[in-house]
């Protein structure tokens, strides 16, 4: 199979065109997890315990109290199929750790058939890409056995919600095998053929095509992929106009300790993608990790200062409101214009290491006109000097974060992330 190049061809400068062209022409091999040597290294956090595995329950799963219920050792995907086929469109996953049942492209997947379902956690629920009992220790990505923990495919609207989970364990495993399951049936639309980034990016969550889910109160932590988008990869391929209807909604989420060699270690918005990110915390996410064979193409995006926790490629749209970025290896790089960053804190995103020769930055935005009410301080506050210092506090005082990263210093009352409990309150 040959990797396919996709992007918004009219967007971006010559640097972008050269970078994307290299991603296609230099990557002529087929990626199969069973044949590629090497690995990006084990996840940096605590490896979740090996969960008990049971044979799938019989297919006569029945709802109780207006929802399908899944307990440890049972099959989340089976409940999603039942909800999609007969309803009700609510699946509750009870406390425990859930791992993949077989090597595949994803552990849990949604496509058009599943639109309108709410999948939510009750108690502490960990979804992990790792299953040491089934993984081959000699292969790339061990102990992960799926490309993506959760996949949202073409045909998903804002009526579909993922809520309350911890998503972890991705480690650079890649397979193109569409058996035992094909997570994305053929799409009758231009520009939506599967390319390299469909398989490699989005270790925690991959969002592809005309897909605009709501992701709420989810912690995405300790994922590694190569080359890009360890936490969440959004690949709308131009099917986003920046409106709420055509944007992924990320609310009250935490992105922590996700790593990749190139761009968007926490969230990566590929060409022509869209997201609204409200009340989220980004901490300890590391782009620009050591380059490996998978990252040779596309190569080093932003070769002097590197990429960041949140990356936007040309033609992508974002609204970032009341978020906190701290301790990342750079905060935001945005190659588009007209994007909005409001009431957010960018504090000391100066994590050491990585391949870029240049200094660390807080914001590298092509247009700073949409940056308002933000508090910014790091090694380089405003890489392009595009941000209005009268509408933001550049070189701000220490926000004095508490253990939950809530600022305690005066003046920060309306800025940055705040923990929430229960259903989302901030819209």
Question: PLM ranges: what are they?
Answer:
Residues 37-38:
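C-terminal motif of bacterial Sec signal peptides marking the signal peptidase cleavage site
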Residues 1-19:
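N-terminal secretory signal peptides that target proteins for export/translocation
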Residues 93, 100, 110, 121, ...:
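Extracellular beta-strand solenoids
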Residues 121-124, 159-171, 193, 211-226, ...:
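Right-handed parallel beta-helix
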Residues 107, 147-149, 173-174, 195, ...:
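Structural detector of coil-to-beta-strand junctions
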Residues 60-94, 99-100, 109, 416-425:
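Acidic Gly/Asp/Thr-rich repetitive segments characteristic of extracellular carbohydrate-active
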């Amino acid at each position: 199979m040959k990797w396919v190049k996709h992007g918004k061809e009219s967007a971006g400068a010559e640097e972008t065109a050269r970078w994307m062209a290299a991603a296609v022409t230099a990557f002529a091999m087929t990626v199969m997890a069973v044949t590629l040597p090497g690995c990006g290294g084990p996840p940096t956090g605590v490896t979740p315990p090996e969960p008990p595995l049971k044979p799938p329950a019989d297919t006569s799963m029945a709802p109780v109290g207006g929802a399908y219920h899944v307990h440890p050792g049972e099959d989340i995907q089976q409940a999603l199929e039942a909800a999609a086929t007969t309803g009700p469109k609510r699946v509750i996953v009870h406390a425990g750790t859930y791992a993949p049942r077989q090597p595949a492209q994803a552990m849990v997947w949604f496509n058009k058939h599943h639109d309108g379902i709410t999948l939510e956690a009750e108690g502490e629920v960990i979804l992990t890409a790792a299953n040491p009992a089934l993984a081959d220790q000699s292969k790339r990505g061990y102990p992960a056995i799926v490309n993506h923990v959760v996949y949202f495919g073409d045909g998903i609207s804002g009526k579909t919600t993922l809520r309350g989970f911890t998503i972890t364990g991705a480690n650079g495993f890649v397979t193109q095998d569409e058996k035992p399951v094909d997570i994305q049936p053929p799409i009758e639309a231009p520009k939506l053929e599967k390319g390299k980034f469909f398989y490699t990016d989005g270790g925690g969550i991959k969002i592809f095509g005309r897909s605009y889910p709501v992701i709420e109160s989810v912690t995405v932590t300790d994922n590694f992929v190569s080359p890009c988008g360890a936490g969440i990869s959004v690949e709308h391929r131009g099917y986003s106009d920046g409106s709420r209807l055509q944007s992924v909604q990320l609310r009250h989420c935490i992105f922590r300790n996700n790593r990749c060699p190139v761009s968007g270690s926490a969230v990566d918005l590929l060409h022509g993608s869209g997201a609204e990110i409200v009340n989220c915390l980004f901490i300890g996410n590391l782009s620009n990790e050591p380059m490996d064979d998978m990252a040779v193409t596309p190569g080093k995006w932003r070769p002097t200062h590197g990429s960041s926790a949140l990356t936007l490629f040309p033609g992508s749209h974002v609204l970032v409101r009341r978020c906190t970025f701290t301790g990342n290896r750079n905060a935001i790089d945005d190659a588009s214009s007209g994007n909005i960053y409001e009431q957010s804190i960018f504090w000391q995103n100066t994590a050491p290491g990585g391949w870029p020769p240049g200094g660390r930055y807080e914001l590298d935005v092509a247009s700073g006109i949409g940056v308002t009410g933000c508090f910014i301080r790091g090694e380089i506050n405003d890489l392009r000097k595009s941000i209005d210092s009268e509408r933001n506090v550049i070189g701000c005082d220490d926000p004095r974060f508490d253990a939950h990263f809530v600022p305690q210093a005066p003046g920060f009352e309306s800025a940055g992330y705040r923990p929430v409990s229960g259903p989302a309150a901030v819209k």
